[in-house]
Amino acid sequence: STQKKLVTLGEYVSRMPEEQKYIYYASGDSVEAVDHLPQTELLKDRSMEILYFTDKTDEFIPDIFRTYGDKAFRSAVDGDLELGDEKQPETADHQETLDFLKETLGSRVDQVKASGKLKSHPVCLTSGEGMTFEMEKYFAAVQPDLALKAKRILEVNVEHPAFAALESARITDPDRAKKYAEILLNQAML
């Protein structure tokens, strides 16, 4: 990620900061698309290396190899990056709005939670453990009848102005708040 060119796993590991425990990877249609994923923001801010997977079958590599040397693979789109010092936001003050988001969005998301990894972005979708969004796309193209779905976790930056607007609207204008919820989900799906 720091050099945005093809690298071997050996080169990647040699450039990893000492405190980086995992081989982080993120997938997308292009280097530019991966580079702009909200989920990678915290890793990049910490100068962590990220493998950019741009081929549809790249996402199968971590499942096949699991490790390289003593380093395990971990998706940047997973819910927990296991950085050790990730700031977990206080949710007690925001739980009603998080519940409102889940209720409004229904089955389109499996879970809504406050995020400790977002900084400048209001929301992102993570897949948790198991199937990723890129794998879902791959299987949909190869076998459309299979209907395999990745888990969709909407992570929300409770310190972002967009969340503050949603929280205010939830109290004063619930119909407007529902529109904000739709906008946030659409933003996360981009």
What name fits each language-model region?
Residues 1-190:
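Long, intrinsically disordered, charge-dense linkers/tails
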